């Protein structure tokens, strides 16, 4: 096998760069400097030797083979939200250059390349009145979201993003191209639905589509000081048997106040009784109710979480209905944030997410949760980071009686993998050992293979 030093030789690098149909930026070039930190979270060390923007799957194969043969650190980036999509003196594959989308209206499926954002996909599928359940922010990368599970506004009514994945194209650590479906390789697609970044470079996904056009949205804003009572009422109601899967609630504790978004995936007539019930909780200072396009819903908080800042976050799961004690802990913690540059976000789960699936269908471990909660902070300066990390740890500790697990798409990466992958951990270790014994794909929420 070639050494890292040998692959640093100009001739070998030149030959590789010339073989790529896409674009390659070398460390030290002006283009490299302009592109190396084009990412959502810049609180990372990212110093690759090469940045490769592939034009096609053959470029991906060449990048994998070159990195493996030269023993280079290898990482993949797409939407640039991932905390782990970085490498040191290795090869960074920026797959955001691959954005083709093909909708099959008759079969209600879509084949989408991994470089697409959620917004890219929504824009195309909405032309047909169709869509998939995805996340909360349109500039999130579709690839990373899907491979970690995929939680968002429509999870209760349509399941996780990865639940709607029916196939994909993968380049493995040997540089081989595989078409992966339940029929062709059931154990591998099981692993991809929740831990997929560990097993290869996914170059495209095939999803089943659902009729998705407009949603009935109620937005209610409460002052921090008076929000405990309406949130307690909401917590009790949202977890009751009266609430259908089509209704979900997103709660955001922000500097502007406590924002409740009650989302009904259906018609105004169907959703009105549920949204009006939530509107009756407390006295909101803002109350807006209307039908809006789903694509608009997915963009509502885009400007609150822009690219190019330093972020820190954790994302555990809540195992029961929101109650007064839990809400008091959350509100008190928000008020004690050291820099006030934070938001606490709760996504309503249950519904389709909780419906039983076969153990070999998906490696997502936290289906029995009521909510996912994210403690998200902007880091104003490097000096603030220790206090922000301590604040996050403290609020997480206080919520431990109600919380479990962590979400691979929002974890800080310091937790044991058992916290992320739960009951699936041992099986995933076995599959990692089988499909990536060298741990070539390690810049992720990493599952280490068994070493002989």
From Swiss-Prot:
Ranges where the FAD-binding PCMH-type domain occurs: 44-212
Keyword Aminoacyl-tRNA synthetase in annotation: no
Cofactor(s) listed: FAD
Entry superkingdom: Eukaryota
Enzyme class, UniProt record, top EC level: oxidoreductase
UniProt KW keywords: FAD, Flavoprotein, Oxidoreductase
GO molecular function terms listed in the Swiss-Prot or TrEMBL record: FAD binding; oxidoreductase activity
Record-listed Pros-8alpha-FAD histidine modification sites: 81
InterPro entries: BBE, FAD-bd_PCMH, FAD-bd_PCMH-like_sf, FAD-bd_PCMH_sub1, FAD-bd_PCMH_sub2, FAD-linked_Oxidoreductase, Oxid_FAD_bind_N
Keyword Transmembrane in record: no
Gene3D superfamilies reported for this sequence: 3.30.465.10, 3.40.462.20, Uridine Diphospho-n-acetylenolpyruvylglucosamine Reductase, domain 2
Family listed: Belongs to the oxygen-dependent FAD-linked oxidoreductase family.
Protein name (database record): FAD-linked oxidoreductase DDB_G0289697
Record organism: Dictyostelium discoideum (Social amoeba)
């Amino acid at each position: 096998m070639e050494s890292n030093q040998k692959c640093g030789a100009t001739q070998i690098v030149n030959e590789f760069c010339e073989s790529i149909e896409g674009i390659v930026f070398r460390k030290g070039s002006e283009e490299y400097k302009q592109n190396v930190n084009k990412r959502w979270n810049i609180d990372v060390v990212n110093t690759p030797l090469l940045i490769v923007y592939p034009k096609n799957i053959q470029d991906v194969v060449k990048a994998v083979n070159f990195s493996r043969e030269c023993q280079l650190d290898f990482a993949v980036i797409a939407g640039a939200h991932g905390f782990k999509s970085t490498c040191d003196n290795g090869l960074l594959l920026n797959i955001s250059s691959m954005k083709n989308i093909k909708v099959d209206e008759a079969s209600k499926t879509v084949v989408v390349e991994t470089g697409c954002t959620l917004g890219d996909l929504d824009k195309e599928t909405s032309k047909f009145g169709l869509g998939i359940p995805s996340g909360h922010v349109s500039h999130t990368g579709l690839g990373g979201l899907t491979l970690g599970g995929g939680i968002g506004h429509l999870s209760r009514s349509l399941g996780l993003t990865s639940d709607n994945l029916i196939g994909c194209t993968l380049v493995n650590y040997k540089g081989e191209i595989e078409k992966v479906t339940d029929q062709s390789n059931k154990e591998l697609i099981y692993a991809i639905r929740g831990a997929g970044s560990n097993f290869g470079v996914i170059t495209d996904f095939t999803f089943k589509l659902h009729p998705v056009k407009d949603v009935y949205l109620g937005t209610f804003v409460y002052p921090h000081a008076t929000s405990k009572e309406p949130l307690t009422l909401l917590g009790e109601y949202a977890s009751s048997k009266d609430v259908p899967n089509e209704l979900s609630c997103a709660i955001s504790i922000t500097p502007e106040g406590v924002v409740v978004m009650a989302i009904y995936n259906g018609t105004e007539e169907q959703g009105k009784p549920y949204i009006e019930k939530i509107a009756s909780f407390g006295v909101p200072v803002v109350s807006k109710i209307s039908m809006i396009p789903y694509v608009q819903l997915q963009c509502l908080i885009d400007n609150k979480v822009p690219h190019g800042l330093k972020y820190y976050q954790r994302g555990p799961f809540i195992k029961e209905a929101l109650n007064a004690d839990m809400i008091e802990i959350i509100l008190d913690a928000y008020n004690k944030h050291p820099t006030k540059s934070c938001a606490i976000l709760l996504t309503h789960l249950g519904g389709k997410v909780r419906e039983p699936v076969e153990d070999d269908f998906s490696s997502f471990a936290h289906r029995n949760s009521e909510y996912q909660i994210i403690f998200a902070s902007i880091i104003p300066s490097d000096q603030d980071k220790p206090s922000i990390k301590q604040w996050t740890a403290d609020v997480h500790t206080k919520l431990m009686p109600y919380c479990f697990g962590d979400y691979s798409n929002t974890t800080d990466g310091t937790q044991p993998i058992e916290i992320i992958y739960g009951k699936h951990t041992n099986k995933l270790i076995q599959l990692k050992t089988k499909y990536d014994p060298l741990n070539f794909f390690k810049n992720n929420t990493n599952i280490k293979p068994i070493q002989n």
